[in-house]
Amino acid sequence: MSKKLPEDFIFGGATAAYQAEGAIKIDGKGPVAWDKFLEENYWYTAEPASDFYHQYPVDLKLCEEFGINGIRISIAWSRIFPNGYGEVNPKGVEFYHKLFAECKKRKVEPFVTLHHFDTPEVLHSNGDFLNRENIEHFVNYAKFCFEEFSEVNYWTTFNEIGPIGDGQYLVGKFPPGIKYDFEKLFQSHHNMVLAHAKAVNLFKKNGYHGEIGMVCALPTKYPYDPNNPKDVRAAELDDIIHNKFILDATFKGEYSKNTMEGVNHILQVNGGKLDLREEDFEELKAAKDLNDFLGINYYMSDWMAEYDGETEIIHNATGNKGSSKYQIKGVGQRKANESIPRTDWDWIIYPQGLYDQISRVKKDYPNYKKIYITENGLGYKDVFEDNTVYDDARIDYIRQHLEVISDAIKDGANVKGYFLWSLMDVFSWSNGYEKRYGLFYVDFETQKRYPKKSAYWYKKVSETKEV
């Protein structure tokens, strides 16, 4: 039996500036840390990516043709302020005005993110968000955008504070490539939520047009053996690292007793001390009820088991199934439940985890107001044939997740839209161009777009509101 989604539900597609735009060195754009990091550590760069900088009229026309009425776009901070602050780059400002005008022309609502993993190099090399000065630079950049781009109706401050700290200071797959540093991880999370709160407080105080929220990656954590208290504790601690610390700060304006006990335990075992100031919490408390929405990025869940050894994390960047490892001293280890499917990159496919995560937000953070699923999708080594991709596995993945969203709405959650990652194939931070997510196949040499089977299926769902 099919399941319904609301008539006003947004069926969107998601992009990000650095992963889609290309044009990383033209029209006055300043460098970001990724430019050098990719050149030095990987076999690919973000040039030309999907050339969205030039191809956006094509992509937005496809949105209109395929029933996609929302798009996630991020502004490249260094395209507006090449050094992160100071002089404004007029060509960057002009580009985003043209982009938003094209969105309006095609009747596609832009949900605009201010920071999607791409701090300008000048600020990044000066400590990124570990340096409190950069919090103020971010707020000033946000203020400029709120005032300049008044045509935008939906703003998000940050995309995925969790994976930023995780990538930069735990796994080391993001610049500056530091591993296993929990002090930096939690401090980065705290300072970024503080920057978010300051931007939200400014937005509301100045009465800017539109709505504002934050996008969080929320992978659901389960105990491998629910009857083993040590497995239960491992899941709780991993949830604090990736989810609860950030959600508490955003929606409670403080860290709950349980959260701080977990953080202090992790820091005691692994070393480190946090700088949490009284004035930080004044700012966080002032903002906690002002978020207009929460964006949830959900791809997978994890099962956690007890673990006594040293920390070792191996990131599977090549699609060699089973090659990843995640075990943290004093926390636990990820242990795959063999009965649950996973991708070649060891991402566990578990739609129920999205339902459980939405339910958790509804229960623990009742001031959330509304939710958008701002990313969800299946990365695949797509086979291009007959000028398309027969991506039935992707269709199945999206269908299952839309079904549990329908269930969550029926059970009282206020979920207003879904943005598939990704609109078209884009550059992937730690996988380059092999791992594809898009509704539209991109030939990265010619930049031609081809609708996949999933694009036609998604069009039908957006028209009928049925899955």
From Swiss-Prot:
Q: Which UniProt keywords apply?
A: Glycosidase, Hydrolase
Q: Which residues are responsible for catalysis?
A: E160, E375
Which EC number(s) does UniProt give? Answer: 3.2.1.85
Explain what induces or represses this protein's expression: Induced during growth on lactose or lactulose.
Activity vs pH? Optimum pH is 7.0-7.5.
Q: In which pathway does it act?
A: Carbohydrate metabolism; lactose degradation; D-galactose 6-phosphate and beta-D-glucose from lactose 6-phosphate: step 1/1
Asked whether the keyword Hydrolase is assigned, the reply is: yes
An example GO CC term for this entry is: cytosol
The record's annotation in InterPro entries points to: 6P-beta-galactosidase, Glyco_hydro_1, Glyco_hydro_1_AS, Glyco_hydro_1_N_CS, Glycoside_hydrolase_SF
Leading EC class: hydrolase
Q: How would you summarize its activity regulation?
A: Inhibited by both galactose-6-phosphate and ATP.
Q: Which family does it belong to?
A: Belongs to the glycosyl hydrolase 1 family.
Q: Which HAMAP family match?
A: LacG (MF_01574)
Q: What is this protein called?
A: 6-phospho-beta-galactosidase
Q: Which organism is it from?
A: Leptotrichia buccalis (strain ATCC 14201 / DSM 1135 / JCM 12969 / NCTC 10249 / C-1013-b)
